[in-house]
């Protein structure tokens, strides 16, 4: 999803529950600068539109860079509101390997003994 979002949308859980979604900077060439902790602020004028993080990104991350925020899923999109006129933007679906797979070891798929194949 391409989205400039915040606490009143797909990043609700990051703001109000404190979830730290996995993030990565999308830039070519890749940055080789050391990571630092960032907080995110949403597009509204509301002080609750703040995601404390920390979200680790290269220290040279700047305005205008694209940041992929993983594991938002369908619920994040469904929770979007029109607060302060936001939330009605275009949605662009971009697919790749799920970010969660970056943190998993390669395993061989096996069929569990308690699974019935229909």
Task: Locate the predicted segments by residue.
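Charged (often Lys/Glu-rich) extended helix/loop segments that serve as interaction or gating elements
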Residues: 1-118
